[in-house]
């Protein structure tokens, strides 16, 4: 497999990735041959379609360099849409939803779960989520807890609540003292 083919199998959205001057559609397409309908689907999954559609020129809306004419949450949704648009085999979300409010983050997680359930076959995407919010990862099949670069816990949300004090403390602090259920 060539390096280009390997790279094409990944979709990566990072917390502070780059948006360039150009249209929203071109920023999501990112130089790839992706039809408009697929871009709209990716934007809908990323919870970006609503705000894009509300713009006068929609997907043709011009962005400034680094997307300074968007909010932090809007930028992150476009970056997630970019990662999803290529239908990756492996999706990496590296703190990519940190600027999203809890409602939008929950809607994004729901859309990703529904897409995964619809693809319960060999075409399903493996998703790797790097997150600081327990709510962003609590439904994951496997959670790795890291401390200073070392894995200190591994399991499901329920398993880690029982076996990993660091995970439990984080979950309790984020939920006002109550363990996430």
Language-model-derived ranges and their functions:
Residues 80, 130:
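Hydrophobic anchor residue at the start of the ABC signature
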Residues 91-94:
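Catalytic Walker B motif of ABC-type/P-loop ATPase nucleotide-binding domains
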Residues 4, 10-15, 128:
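ABC nucleotide-binding domain signature
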Residues 85-89:
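A short, proline-enriched helix->beta-strand linker immediately N-terminal to the Walker B motif
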Residues 45, 53-58, 103, 118-124, ...:
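C-terminal portion of ABC ATPase nucleotide-binding domains
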Residues 7, 25-65, 109-117, 124, ...:
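ABC ATPase nucleotide-binding domain helical subdomain, centered on the C-loop/LSGGQ "ABC signature"
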Residues 16-35, 70, 137:
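Conserved catalytic motifs of ABC-family nucleotide-binding domains
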């Amino acid at each position: 497999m060539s390096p280009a083919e390997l790279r094409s199998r990944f979709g990566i959205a990072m917390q502070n990735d780059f948006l360039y001057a150009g249209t929203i559609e071109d920023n999501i397409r990112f130089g790839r041959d992706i039809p408009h309908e697929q871009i709209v689907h990716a934007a809908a999954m990323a919870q970006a379609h609503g705000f894009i559609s509300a713009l006068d020129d929609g997907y043709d809306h011009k962005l400034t360099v680094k997307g300074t004419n968007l909010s932090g949450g809007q930028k992150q949704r476009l970056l997630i849409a970019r990662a999803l648009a290529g239908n990756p085999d492996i999706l990496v979300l590296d703190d990519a939803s940190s600027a999203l409010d809890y409602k939008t983050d929950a809607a994004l997680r729901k859309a990703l779960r529904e897409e995964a359930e619809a693809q319960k076959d060999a075409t399903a995407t493996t998703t790797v989520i790097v997150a600081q919010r327990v709510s962003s990862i609590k439904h994951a099949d496997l959670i790795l807890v890291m401390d200073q670069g070392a894995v200190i816990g591994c399991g499901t949300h329920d398993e880690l609540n029982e076996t990993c004090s660091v995970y439990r403390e984080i979950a309790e602090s984020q939920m006002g003292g109550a363990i996430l259920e």
